[in-house]
C-alpha cells in the first residue's frame, strides 16, 4: 500500500533531510522563499535539463540552441513592453497588513471569475466589492487601493548609479532569443520552420512568492521560440501539445490523471498571444500552471524591428516573399517541473512486515544515482570499492554506501530514488577479474545475482522492459 505525503511541509522536510534542497542562507535565518540545491538536487536538476534538451532539441532536425546574457540593453524591455506593462496589481489588507496580488486573490476566491490581464485597478476593485472578497488571513474586508508594482529587478551597470546606467535582470529568456533571431538564422543558414531553444535563469520580483519552489524570485526556464509561416501555426501548436503531454507522462513520470489542460479565454490572454494552453499539475496546493504553450504571432519580432529599425524579416526563397515569422512558444520552469516530479514520485509504502519505507519512484534518466554499491560488511569495503571504481568507468552515476546495516542502506537509497543497490558479499570474488554480486531493484526489491561483465546488458534490458510497460499503459 502506498500513500502520498499529507502536506507540502512533510515533503519539503524529507527533501531537505536527504540533500535535495536547503533553505537559502540558513545560518542567517534564511531569505524568504529562496532555496539552494544540494548534491542530489543538482544531479536531479541537471538530469531533467538534459532530458528536456535531448527530447526537444537533440532529437529534432530543426532546433538549435542559444545562451543569451541575463542583462540586456534596456531598450529590449522597452520594445517588449516589460518596462511599461510587466507589473502585478498589489493590494494590502489594512487590518492584518498581509499583501496580495489582486488577480490571484480573486482567483483563489473563485476560479470561474475571469479577469483580463490588462484590467484596470478600478475593475479589480469592482470585482472585490461586488463579490465581497474578504482577506483570507484575518477575514476582514478592509483593503488599500490597488497599485501596480513592476516585477523587474533594477540595477546599475558601471561604477556610478546614474539613471543612464540603469539595467535590469531579465524577467524571461524569450527576448534574448528574439533579438538574436537574425544572427542565428544567418549563421546557421536556417530555413523556416525552425526553433531556437534556451535554458537559463530569469528573475521576477514577485509580490507573493511561495509554495516551496513553485514560485520563486530566481528561477530557470526551458523554452523554445519556434519560427514559422502563419499558415501552419495551429498545426505546430497542436504538435507541441501532444509531444509535451507524452514527454511529461513517459519521460518525467507524471500521472496523466494529475494533469489537465487549461485554455486561456480571450480576456485572459497576454497582449502578445493569440492562443495559450497551459498544462496544469495537481500539486499539493492544488492544480496550478506547469507547462505553457503560446502562439505569440509575430508580435515580438515586429516590436523589436520597429524600435531598433533593424530588418528582422525572413526571405522565403520558394515564394520570393519577405515577411515577419510567427512564433509558437513552449515554455516550462525547471523548478516548477522539478517540484511536480518530486511530488509525483515520492510516497510512503507500507511493506508486508508492517514496516514503512519512503520510496522515490524516479525514472531511470532522472534518478540522481542509478546504482549504489554496498559492502555486506565493513571488511569487504576494499573489494566493494574496486567494483565501485569499475562501475564509474562505465560512465554510470553511482554512489558508495557503507554506513549502517544493509537494511538501513537499502531504505536510504530507496528514499532518494536510487534505482539499483549492488551488494558485495563473501561470494563475490570467486573470479577476481569478473566479480559477481546481488543487484536489488528499487521498486520491487527483487534481487538477482549477476556478473560485473553482465551489468551493462542487464541495465539495458531493464530499461527496455520499463519502456514496454509504459507503452502498454
Swiss-Prot record:
SUPFAM superfamilies cross-referenced by the UniProt entry:
Class II aaRS ABD-related, Class II aaRS and biotin synthetases
Predominant location: cytoplasm
Q: Which keywords does this chain's UniProt record carry?
A: Aminoacyl-tRNA synthetase, ATP-binding, Cytoplasm, Ligase, Nucleotide-binding, Protein biosynthesis
Q: Catalyses which reaction? A: tRNA(Gly) + glycine + ATP = glycyl-tRNA(Gly) + AMP + diphosphate
Q: Which GO terms describe its biological process?
A: glycyl-tRNA aminoacylation
- Enzyme Commission number(s) of this protein: 6.1.1.14
Assembly behavior: Homodimer.
Protein name as it appears in the record: Glycine--tRNA ligase
Q: Which organism is it from?
A: Ureaplasma parvum serovar 3 (strain ATCC 700970)
Amino acid at each position: 500500500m502506498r500513500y502520498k505525503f499529507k502536506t507540502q511541509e512533510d515533503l519539503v522536510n524529507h527533501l531537505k533531510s536527504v540533500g535535495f534542497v536547503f533553505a537559502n542562507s540558513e545560518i542567517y535565518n534564511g531569505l524568504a522563499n529562496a532555496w539552494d540545491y544540494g548534491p542530489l538536487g543538482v544531479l536531479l536538476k541537471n538530469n531533467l535539463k538534459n532530458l528536456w534538451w535531448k527530447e526537444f532539441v537533440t532529437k529534432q532536425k530543426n532546433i538549435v540552441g542559444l545562451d543569451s546574457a541575463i542583462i540586456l540593453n534596456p531598450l529590449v524591455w522597452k520594445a517588449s513592453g516589460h518596462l511599461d506593462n510587466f507589473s502585478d496589481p498589489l493590494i494590502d489588507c489594512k487590518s492584518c497588513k498581509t499583501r496580495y496580488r489582486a488577480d490571484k486573490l480573486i482567483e483563489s476566491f473563485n476560479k470561474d471569475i475571469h479577469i483580463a490581464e490588462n484590467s484596470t485597478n478600478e475593475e479589480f476593485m469592482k470585482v472585490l466589492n461586488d463579490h465581497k472578497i474578504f482577506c483570507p488571513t484575518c477575514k476582514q474586508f478592509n483593503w488599500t487601493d490597488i497599485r501596480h508594482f513592476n516585477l523587474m529587478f533594477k540595477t546599475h551597470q558601471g561604477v556610478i548609479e546614474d539613471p543612464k546606467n540603469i539595467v535590469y535582470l531579465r524577467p524571461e529568456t524569450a527576448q534574448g532569443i528574439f533579438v538574436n533571431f537574425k544572427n542565428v538564422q544567418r549563421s546557421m543558414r536556417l530555413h523556416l520552420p525552425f526553433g531556437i531553444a534556451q535554458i537559463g535563469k530569469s528573475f521576477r520580483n514577485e509580490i507573493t512568492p511561495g509554495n516551496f519552489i513553485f514560485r520563486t524570485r530566481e528561477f530557470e526556464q526551458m523554452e523554445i521560440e519556434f519560427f514559422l509561416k502563419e499558415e501552419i501555426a495551429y498545426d505546430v501548436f497542436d504538435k507541441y501539445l501532444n509531444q509535451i503531454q507524452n514527454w511529461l507522462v513517459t519521460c518525467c513520470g507524471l500521472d496523466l490523471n494529475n494533469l489537465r489542460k487549461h485554455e486561456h479565454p480571450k480576456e485572459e490572454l497576454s497582449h502578445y498571444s493569440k492562443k495559450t494552453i497551459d498544462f496544469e499539475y495537481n500539486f499539493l496546493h492544488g492544480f496550478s500552471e506547469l507547462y505553457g504553450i503560446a502562439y505569440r504571432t509575430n508580435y515580438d519580432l515586429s516590436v523589436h524591428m520597429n524600435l531598433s529599425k533593424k530588418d528582422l524579416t525572413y526571405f522565403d526563397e520558394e515564394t520570393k516573399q519577405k515577411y515577419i515569422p510567427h512564433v509558437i512558444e513552449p515554455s516550462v520552469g525547471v523548478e516548477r517541473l522539478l517540484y511536480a516530479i518530486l511530488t509525483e514520485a515520492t510516497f510512503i509504502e507500507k511493506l508486508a512486515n508492517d514496516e514503512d519505507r519512503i520510496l522515490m519512484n524516479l525514472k531511470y534518466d532522472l534518478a540522481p544515482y542509478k546504482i549504489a554499491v554496498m559492502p555486506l560488511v565493513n571488511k569487504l569495503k576494499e573489494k566493494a570499492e574496486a567494483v565501485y571504481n569499475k562501475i564509474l568507468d562505465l560512465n554510470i552515476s553511482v554512489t558508495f554506501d557503507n554506513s549502517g546495516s544493509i537494511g538501513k542502506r537499502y531504505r536510504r537509497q530507496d528514499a532518494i530514488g536510487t534505482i539499483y543497490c549492488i551488494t558485495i558479499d563473501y561470494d563475490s570474488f570467486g573470479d577476481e577479474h569478473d566479480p559477481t554480486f546481488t543487484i536489488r531493484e528499487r521498486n520491487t526489491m527483487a534481487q538477482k545475482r549477476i556478473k560485473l561483465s553482465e551489468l551493462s546488458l542487464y541495465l539495458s534490458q531493464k530499461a527496455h522492459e520499463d519502456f514496454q510497460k509504459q507503452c502498454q499503459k
